[in-house]
Amino acid sequence: MNFFQAIILAIAQGVSELFPISSVAHSVIIPYLFGWKLSPFFLKTNFLEFVVMMHIGTTISLIVYFRKDWKKMLKSLFNKKTSKRNLALIVIGTIPAIILGAIFEQTITNAFSDVIVASIFLIFNGLLLFFGEQTKKRGNKSIEDLKGWQALVIGCFQSLALIPGFSRSGSSITAGFWMGLSNEESARFSMLLSTPMVAGAATLEIPKLIKNHVPGLLSLSLIGGIVAGLAAFLSIYILMHWFNHKKNNTMLPFAIYCIVIGIGVLASKAI
């Protein structure tokens, strides 16, 4: 992997991890479009340090952007403020992904990390976003209004991201719509849910990283982490402002993008 490939992959990671367009699908599709031999399995086997640093960069951006939320929630552990309830809802929402990820992630990744399969599920992701937009409740609930079972449902939808092509944020934002959250609160809850998941993904790989450190990869990995972090921060800023100011058809552009890219890649494979 060269410098140019590292920059492109880092930007793609930072943007697609938080935009509802599936980071895993893009990690499969982008190397295919550029003609690179860099599958997710290859990256995890040979460039694990780079992958971990991209996740760390994204995690730092999430924490920095939502630092006020996390500060309130951590302080709430020592009092009876509403923020304690928000923290509990986030914990509940992460349970499905932790359980299902521990059981099925490796199997699913090995089975579905294929350009054709990723493109098919990217189309399904677009259809989910479109259907979610058309059927959302136009709610005005805030995060603290959620019941425990509703947070669990949103967490279950987030688990769809284990399948390459489905977006973690797209699935959880759509579920948030169905649970009656407002546009901005649905996006906020999705981002807050993403933080422990992305951080956990990096943490789980650290023991492998220590064992299989590749000499000379540190500088490329640091650059990848910084670029992914900056791209992620900008993506969060754009996404939150988008959901705050636009009340209708919020998911439609992302749905169209996923469907068009998925169909385009499938068509290129068929030619």
Swiss-Prot record:
Quote one Gene Ontology molecular function term: undecaprenyl-diphosphatase activity
Q: Which GO terms describe its cellular component?
A: plasma membrane
Compartment list: Cell membrane
Q: Name one GO biological process term.
A: peptidoglycan biosynthetic process
**Entry's Pfam families?**
BacA
Keyword Membrane tagged: yes
Q: Which cysteine pairs make disulfide bonds?
A: none
Coarsely, its chief localization is membrane
Instruction: Name the PANTHER family on file.
Output: UNDECAPRENYL-DIPHOSPHATASE
Family statement drawn from the similarity comment of this UniProt entry: Belongs to the UppP family.
Other known facts:
Bacitracin is thought to be involved in the inhibition of peptidoglycan synthesis by sequestering undecaprenyl diphosphate, thereby reducing the pool of lipid carrier available.
Put simply, this protein is called Undecaprenyl-diphosphatase 2
- In which organism is this protein found? Oenococcus oeni (strain ATCC BAA-331 / PSU-1)
Supply the gene name: uppP2
